[in-house]
């Protein structure tokens, strides 16, 4: 049912100062520190435990009646 739901995963690689040979990128070099950095974006199925999913569901349900950008009133109301 939900097996096809995917989310973007962003990975940032910073190899500045690393002596390993970079063979993945074959395009033109920029000649500066950007040659040693990379951003990878992929789509994958998120893996979340049932316990974490239930906590988030309860959190979302608890706030569903709150309007956007309206602060919640905390504590008890004083009676004068």
Curated annotation (Swiss-Prot):
GO-annotated cellular components: chloroplast thylakoid membrane; phycobilisome
Topology of the protein relative to the lipid bilayer: Peripheral membrane protein
Main location: plastid
Pfam families in alphabetical order: Phycoerythr_ab
GO biological process assignments: photosynthesis
Post-translational modification: Contains one phycocyanobilin chromophore, one mesobiliverdin chromophore and one 15,16-dihydrobiliverdin chromophore with binding mediated by both the alpha and beta subunits.
Binding site for mesobiliverdin: 18, 24-25, 40
Residues engaged in binding (2R,3E)-phycocyanobilin: 16
Cellular location(s): Plastid, Chloroplast thylakoid membrane
Binding site for 15,16-dihydrobiliverdin: 71, 73
Entries under InterPro entries matching the protein: Globular_prot_asu/bsu (IPR011070), Phycoerythr-like_a_sf (IPR037011), Phycoerythr_a (IPR004228)
Gene3D superfamilies: Phycoerythrin alpha chain (3.90.510.10)
Keywords for this protein: Bile pigment, Chloroplast, Chromophore, Electron transport, Membrane, Photosynthesis, Plastid, Thylakoid, Transport
SUPFAM superfamilies attached to this UniProt entry: Non-globular alpha+beta subunits of globular proteins
Quaternary organization: Heterotetramer of 2 different alpha chains and 2 identical beta chains which form 2 alpha-beta heterodimers within the heterotetramer.
Additional free-text comment from the UniProt record: The light-harvesting system in Cryptophytes contains phycobiliprotein complexes. Unusually they are composed of either phycoerythrin (CPE) or phycocyanin (CPC) but never allophycocyanin (APC), with only one type of biliprotein being present in any one species. Unlike cyanobacteria or red algae these proteins are not arranged into higher-order phycobilisome complexes, and they are found in the thylakoid lumen.
Physiological role: Light-harvesting photosynthetic tetrapyrrole chromophore-protein from the phycobiliprotein complex.
Family that this chain belongs to: Belongs to the phycoerythrin family.
Protein name: Phycocyanin-645 alpha-1 chain
